[in-house]
Amino acid sequence: MKKILLALAALTLAASAQFSTIDNDTLLKMQAQGTPVIDIRTPGEWSTTGIIKGSHKMMFFNEKGQPDMGNWFFELGHLIKDKDQPFIVYCAHANRSKALGQFLDKQLGFKNVYELKGGIEHGWIPAGKPVVK
């Protein structure tokens, strides 16, 4: 009985985990269907590499690596209307976006948060996908 309860608990946790990593083509498909894409990098990074066309520039971590949560969540509230609405976050290498996505999912209850595999520098650009400056 104990094993059954543990298995059910594990399945429940797995079913409720909504944060996931997506590839470039999935991002394009979701974006074409209206899913917002958010670039959480810094202005310096945006100017160096460009951004994915149609992305919303919403810096989460400043140049010193400190989060700017108040401003970011203010901006997010204008873009994302409820915690069930899907959206995609990305950064340079997927480290910051993964940390943010997991936080949004596990701590704040956002149900459909996605992050771009490899970020813009290790996933998007090497695959030959376009950027805009």
Predicted regions and their residues:
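Short, surface-exposed ligand- or partner-binding patches at beta-edge/loop junctions that are enriched
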Residues: 90-91
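Structural scaffold elements adjacent to functional motifs in cytosolic proteins
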Residues: 37-39
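Generic cytosolic/nucleocytoplasmic N-terminal low-complexity/intrinsically disordered segments
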Residues: 1-2, 63
